[in-house]
């Protein structure tokens, strides 16, 4: 089968035509891939950064955001049928630890990821345990379903705390941050402010309903950044700090600024992964009585039900997809992702 694989311990990703079709077991399904989306994780693997060097076995078929069709299944599978349109949870869990048995599978200590630790979705076929498969409702397109993984991250982050009527600060306007703008607006947030240094994506955030999308690139230090943020808050009629913070950047200066402008009793969901250690004002956390929640992946499968229900109720995520390419143009897709001048990039695996 055709697949995209990390074949060498250097930057790049390569197309192969002779990858074996994976074998499925008693409780597995075989999925024919129709659409995949390029994730920031895939870009890290492409660039072969320090995280990738320490994490990714080579060779490895990568990718974990997908939509496809079930074409075969093991004898033990009763939850899906051949012909079903599906996406799937890319975190594979043990099912036996305390968290798994308590229904908190997203907190499994033994989690492994498709396209990271085991064969991924950038291939014509993917094998996945049936318990990880999620049926796509007829009203949702394959393109949108292929973005369920990052959309689920955004849902989990944004809906960890009640957004309705609240003032929300989002740091980081990558695709997940942009999705969070859509979610916060759909759920009735009062004011939504988002920060980033990428003007293309900040304009997308404005189009998605952000009250203010602030380009923080011009500010030379933390004091200037906080001063400008307080001006923004005043300009839009805020008399207190932000109620909810959604941290999507993993950038120390963004996190420090967020802590500075949160209201007393504010709540923060932290999704952004830092490349190094983070230094924060511990006193601000204590004396403001802030609540911080780390976010990893999606709640299985409450997050999935929430996002499909919200899409069916009218939340429009189609504008997050800015580029659609055939799989033979995958190099162009990765170049677009590296440029940052995009939302989600979809790869079509049809013949």
UniProtKB/Swiss-Prot annotation:
GO terms for cellular component: cytoplasm. Gene3D superfamilies: Medium-chain alcohol dehydrogenases, catalytic domain, NAD(P)-binding Rossmann-like Domain. Its cofactor is Zn(2+). Keywords: Cytoplasm, Metal-binding, NAD, Oxidoreductase, Zinc. It catalyses: L-threonine + NAD(+) = (2S)-2-amino-3-oxobutanoate + NADH + H(+). Zn(2+) 1 binds at residues 39, 64-65. One of its GO terms (molecular function) is zinc ion binding. The keyword Signal does not apply. It is found in: Cytoplasm. The active site is at residues 41, 44. PROSITE patterns: ADH_ZINC. Its EC number is 1.1.1.103. The record marks 149 as: Important for catalytic activity for the proton relay mechanism but does not participate directly in the coordination of zinc atom. Pathway: Amino-acid degradation; L-threonine degradation via oxydo-reductase pathway; glycine from L-threonine: step 1/2. Catalyzes the NAD(+)-dependent oxidation of L-threonine to 2-amino-3-ketobutyrate. Belongs to the zinc-containing alcohol dehydrogenase family. Homotetramer. NCBIfam families: PRK05396.1 (NF003808), tdh (TIGR00692). This is L-threonine 3-dehydrogenase. It comes from Francisella tularensis subsp. novicida (strain U112). The gene is tdh.
